[in-house]
Design a protein with these regions (language model features):
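Active-site metal-coordination/substrate-binding segment of hydrolases
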Residues: 53-54, 61, 67-135, 152, ...
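Short glycine/serine- and small hydrophobic-enriched flexible loop segments
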Residues: 13, 115-122, 208-214, 364-367
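Midchain, well-structured core segments that form catalytic/ion-binding scaffolds
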Residues: 85, 91-101, 138-287, 317
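A non-catalytic alpha/beta surface segment that caps or lines the substrate-entry region
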Residues: 20-67
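Short, low-order "capping/linker" segments at domain edges
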Residues: 289-304
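N-terminal capping segment at the start of a domain
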Residues: 1-25, 284, 341-345
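Acidic, glycine-rich active-site loops and adjacent beta-strand->loop/helix elements
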Residues: 48, 77-79, 134-142, 164-166, ...
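Zn-dependent metallopeptidase/amidohydrolase metal-coordination segment
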Residues: 7-8, 56, 229, 240, ...
Length: 369
């Protein structure tokens, strides 16, 4: 059913188009041309202007005469670094880079699978209802494309995001919310050689606070991390300012609040012990979603997998994706496993048979809707 060579050629073509976060212009233009060739109406929004990027989200619609719920298929156009000048290699049915860059199967595999699926639907004249295709920008940079989207343009009742690890047939039905955490600790400067006793090191205070925090894997639903520390000016100055940047995630809103409160309390208590102060800011990054096997989108994903002879696997994840944002807009959405591995590393790989299966999965979802 799937034109394997055409799909492979398109994947190899797209991974070689540089598409860093907020610099997706080249791949956006290529995809707009592909939509035109397919006879599918597509438009680009103004997200690029809003986030100071070079391209916006692409939203395409393929209308059909079938009385069926509208479906949304989504993938993101950007990729992590090092993702420029990718030179794909094929060995024993596995696609990889030359080892100096990522492969960008995350998420070119999703884009290619969707496009091939649409071609098959057209070529075989498979009856379908309204199909919406969303290719977002700046997913890797903080889900900015999805956050800036005008959701009123989406009519879909179910969303399928081709952007997860695990073999094809994996259906991610739960993902955490994330809060961003930023604290600036204000110490007291002094000459480190002449009068260190007159200073209070903000770095020491920060180190003591971090050592007291519960971080990493808190429980099966909750994680926390301090990922950035910025501070100090010179070795001969007791540092009077340090910035800590971190996050907390959980599939439980109560646990998420508790973790963030714990991190804030530890910093304030430690600052109090040293007689210094801190400015702390907590902000929402994205919300959680949790679906079950009775939800239409999950039923359809499972039915489509079974029609292919696959055993659907319902999974939870600790990561966020555009699906978190779209679920927040009221469109029940799942994330589908693509079969790639070692994403965000120079060891990233994409088995060709999984790429073919992902495209077939798109067709099966449409057929079974």
């Amino acid at each position: 059913m799937i034109n394997k060579q055409r799909l492979l050629d398109e994947f190899l073509e797209l991974v070689q188009i540089d598409s860093a976060t907020k610099d997706e212009r080249k791949i956006a233009d290529a995809l707009l041309a592909k939509f035109r060739a397919l006879g599918i109406t597509a438009e680009e929004d103004d997200t690029g202007d809003k986030i100071q990027g070079t391209a916006g989200n692409l939203l395409a619609v393929m209308d059909g005469g079938k009385d069926a719920p509208a479906l949304l298929f989504c993938a993101h156009m950007d990729r992590v670094e090092p993702g420029s000048g990718i030179k794909p290699q094929i060995k024993d049915g596995i696609i990889s880079s030359d080892g100096t860059t990522i492969l960008a199967a995350d998420d070119v595999a999703g884009i290619a699978a969707i496009l091939e699926g649409l071609r098959i639907v057209k070529e075989r004249q498979i009856p379908h209802g309204r199909i919406e295709i969303l290719f977002t920008v700046a997913e890797e940079g903080g889900l900015y494309g999805a956050k800036m989207l005008d959701a009123s343009k989406l009519k879909a009742k179910a969303g399928f995001f081709l952007d997860a690890g695990g073999p094809v047939g994996t259906v991610v039905v739960q993902a955490p919310a994330q809060k961003n955490f930023r604290a600036v600790i204000h110490g007291k400067a002094a000459h480190a050689g002449v009068a260190p006793e007159n200073g209070i090191s903000a770095i020491v205070v920060a180190a003591q606070a971090i050592a007291k925090m519960n971080l990493g894997r808190i429980d099966q639903e909750t994680t926390a991390n301090i990922g950035l520390i910025r501070g100090g000016e010179a070795t001969n100055i007791i540092p009077d300012r340090v910035e800590l940047v971190g996050e907390a995630r959980s599939r439980s809103s109560a646990k998420l609040e508790k973790q963030v409160e714990h991190m804030e309390e530890v910093i304030r208590r430690t600052c109090s012990d040293y007689g210094v102060s801190a400015d702390i800011k907590v902000s929402d990054s994205y919300g959680a979603f949790s679906l079950n096997q009775n939800d239409f989108v999950v039923k359809l994903a499972c039915q489509a997998a079974e029609a292919m002879g696959l055993e659907p696997r319902l999974e939870s994840t600790g990561g966020g994706s555009d699906a978190n944002i779209i679920n927040g807009y009221g469109i029940s959405s799942v994330v589908l496993g693509m079969g790639y591995d070692h994403v965000h590393t120079t060891s990233e790989v994409m088995p060709i048979d999984q790429l073919v299966a992902a495209a077939a999965y798109v067709v099966s979802i449409i057929e079974n809707s």
